[in-house]
């Protein structure tokens, strides 16, 4: 019996870590595939709109069946909150992120997203959702150092390509022409990095905003479904920035259709629900610490599935990123242990002091 209880505690302790790892590994594969779809020439916000619509359709039955008895009543304020959530975490974020992805590569996009823990941590300190005093503790210093190492690994991977260490040859989807756009993409490389950075900041703001929203509206399936519905319409409006041709919405390329469905189901519905749950469990800073894994996942997916060359810089940068992530989680674990020990000590103190008060009140005068 005691062994079963201990097993349950272990599962409860590590389930957020397992879920966040799986979620971000999946996101790495989504980013690599979406990059290939963008190279075909599809309007990036058309991909975003379809992706959000598919996410909403997938989540409707889950929200209805699993949360119909626990779902709070929708108020106008909650509708506005989900509209803002859709802007920060989906439509505007995708507008800048996919635009930057079209100018750069899946590896670079994931590398810049790897700075999410640092940005979220800094914003959390600014908005006071993280305590400034933790910087004076060992756990706090481990989190800061781990975050800085994550950033270093991401920057190393981005700016140091290094020699090719594999014999794989780049493989691209048939019918897509890359040669004519190579020079344009090289010229817009810095602009693409700027767009990706803006997208990462928006994603950080969404994670902090979602931390508050998940308390007011704790139904993760319904919340993600509402967010996806609003974001689908927002993406459709933002698509007018690039083109107003109705034919852009007609997609007959099977590869692109497959990527959009995969991105909607896995990259939006599943990962957003998982991230929302992770934020609710252990906070926005904790959830953001796993985003560097998308970098490693995208690099491996490019190499093993899409057969793009593997470079030394990618390997070294990935190893440095993993080291930083491990240090951050180490610090987070120490912080959790300290909080648990403190609360246990307070409970024990209350347990011992309460009987004394009762005895004093019953003692004769």
Curated annotation (Swiss-Prot):
Q: From what superkingdom does this record's organism come? A: Eukaryota
What's the protein here called?
A: WAT1-related protein At1g01070
Q: Which cysteines are joined by disulfide bonds?
A: none
The EamA domain covers: 27-157, 223-329
- Coarsely, its chief localization is membrane
Identify one Gene Ontology CC term for this UniProt entry.
Answer: plasma membrane
Question: Top-down, what is the taxonomic lineage of the species of origin?
Answer: Eukaryota, Viridiplantae, Streptophyta, Embryophyta, Tracheophyta
* Membrane-traversing stretches: 14-34, 46-66, 83-103, 107-127, 139-159, 189-209, 221-241, 255-275, 285-305, 310-330
Q: Which UniProt keywords apply?
A: Membrane, Repeat, Transmembrane, Transmembrane helix
Indicate, by first and last residue, each region the UniProt record lists as having compositional bias (Polar residues).
340-356
Return one Gene Ontology term, BP aspect: seed development
Show the PANTHER family listed in the entry: WAT1-RELATED PROTEIN
The family this protein is said to belong to: Belongs to the drug/metabolite transporter (DMT) superfamily. Plant drug/metabolite exporter (P-DME) (TC 2.A.7.4) family.
Membrane protein topology class:
Multi-pass membrane protein
The record's subcellular locations are: Membrane
Q: What single Pfam family name could you report for this chain, choosing any that match?
A: EamA
User: Which InterPro entries is this protein grouped with?
Assistant: EamA_dom, WAT1-related
- Disordered: region residues: 340-365
Care to name a GO molecular-function term for this sequence?
L-glutamine transmembrane transporter activity
